[in-house]
């Protein structure tokens, strides 16, 4: 005699693990795109210091020399760089009324939208930001193999490069993959002092040479990513539009339609690119 066994569906959903975005720690939103799809930033030149021409009794014989005692009188240059938003992305899906009822309400528009943002939208935005930052970094030494013996010295070299470029010493962040962080924890020089819960809640796992250490999943970073030391002033990461809607009463379906649109981008500022040091691995 055959027996048909019962299959029970649990009233929970097996969602994917997805890390929270850390981009806000590494970038800024100092510029306003309201009413425009692009903005232009001025880059103003400077002039060198001269030896003041004191006690001069005759006009200079060299006609190329300025009559001014302060030095040659030249105009400052004012060039621009354009920041044009390139990513205008969208999604749409339907939650059928019968499907919602017959899945014990697990297929529900509100939670489905939150899942879409967490598992699809945020990872894409993050990946774009990290790609832009590594591509536009002002310091990019040759790719090298990182080990527990050299990782600490390599990071100190990055810190020195930013110091020599006169990048502010505060608010720096060190971006590492889980693999790089594992090497760092094995380095004898690493300070294993535990940090507070408040900093961990923000995504900071340690502090090294004054920089907050931020661990980012490898899937959101370029291939061969070793580590990146950054100051947030170097990268602008605007999100001009975030438009997400749940439409219950529509003639297009017997159910709930969820739509979303996000317009975003990231830019490394030309005069501040020295605030990013990117080390690739072999």
Name each model-derived stretch.
Residues 135-205:
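Extended, solvent-exposed, turn-rich assembly/linker loops in the middle of proteins
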Residues 44, 97, 178:
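Residues immediately flanking
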Residues 97-165, 277-282:
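Alpha-helical scaffold segments that mediate packing/assembly in large oligomeric complexes
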Residues 59, 65-66:
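P-loop NTPase signaling cores
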Residues 71-109:
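Long, hydrophobic/aromatic-enriched structural stretches that serve as scaffold segments
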